[in-house]
């Protein structure tokens, strides 16, 4: 049975790999900073915005909150009203990108934010995944899954081979014998990187 799960896991990774083969086509440039008095200038701010395809006002709002200072955009440049190191800027930009831009499943930057009621969803154009946006704190509080443990997941799509797929805590979980829209309790059988194979323990319909 272990060999069967290993084969399923390799097949699952091949499926994800083929569906996201172009995720590296978008490259985010490193912030180019200069000093003007006490201010820090990101000379290529608009270049970064053009790549990540986000509202610059939202990025500025995030950086203002994180850096605790006044920030304004001037043309293609961003003016930060205090001295900030390149390392600090990279850390904050990576935090923004990993929360609001990068797909939680395949890592693609080709995403957009959509509203569903009061919930903001990160929608991936590369793999089709849709996830409520999580803060870094929320990720840390519930990161990871473990082999042998049980989790309740919702099947978000069904692959061409009939296997259900669920997105959970940054993992793509393949669950054979499930249908799109089902909520099931599963046991994790095998994990490799950010892909897992699971089997159904119970279904919501089983409790009715």
UniProtKB/Swiss-Prot annotation:
Taxonomic lineage of the native organism: Archaea, Methanobacteriati, Thermoplasmatota, Thermoplasmata, Thermoplasmatales
Family matches, as SMART domains: eIF2B_5 (SM00653)
Annotated gene: eif2b
Function: eIF-2 functions in the early steps of protein synthesis by forming a ternary complex with GTP and initiator tRNA.
Single GO MF annotation: translation initiation factor activity
Residues of the TRAM domain: 144-202
Subunit structure: Heterotrimer composed of an alpha, a beta and a gamma chain.
Keywords: Initiation factor, Protein biosynthesis
Signal peptide (residue range): none
Keyword Protein biosynthesis included in the entry's annotation: yes
InterPro entries membership: IF2/IF5 (IPR045196), NA-bd_OB-fold (IPR012340), TIF2_bsu_arc (IPR004458), TRAM_dom (IPR002792), Transl_init_fac_IF2/IF5_dom (IPR002735), Transl_init_fac_IF2/IF5_N (IPR016189), Transl_init_fac_IF2/IF5_Zn-bd (IPR016190)
HAMAP family given in the database record: eIF_2_beta
The family this protein is said to belong to: Belongs to the eIF-2-beta/eIF-5 family.
Domain of life: Archaea
Protein's name in the database: Translation initiation factor 2 subunit beta
Transmembrane parts of this sequence: none
């Amino acid at each position: 049975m272990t060999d069967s799960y290993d084969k399923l896991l390799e097949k699952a990774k091949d499926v994800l790999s083929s569906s996201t083969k172009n995720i590296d086509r978008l490259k985010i440039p490193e912030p180019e900073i200069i000093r003007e008095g006490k201010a820090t200038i990101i000379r290529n701010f608009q270049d970064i915005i053009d790549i990540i395809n986000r509202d610059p006002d939202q990025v500025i709002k995030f950086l203002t909150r994180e850096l605790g200072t006044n920030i304004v955009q001037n043309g293609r440049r961003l003016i930060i009203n205090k001295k900030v190191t390149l390392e600090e800027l990279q850390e904050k930009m990576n935090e923004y990108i990993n929360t609001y831009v990068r797909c939680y499943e395949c890592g693609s930057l080709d995403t957009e934010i959509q509203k569903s009621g009061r919930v903001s969803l990160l929608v991936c154009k590369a793999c089709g995944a849709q996830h409520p946006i999580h803060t870094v704190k929320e990720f840390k509080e519930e990161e990871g899954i473990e082999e042998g443990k049980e989790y309740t997941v919702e099947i978000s799509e069904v692959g061409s081979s009939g296997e259900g797929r669920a997105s959970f805590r940054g993992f793509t979980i393949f669950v054979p014998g499930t249908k799109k829209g089902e909520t099931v309790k599963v046991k994790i059988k095998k994990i490799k990187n950010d892909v897992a194979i699971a089997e159904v323990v119970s279904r919501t319909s089983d409790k009715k």
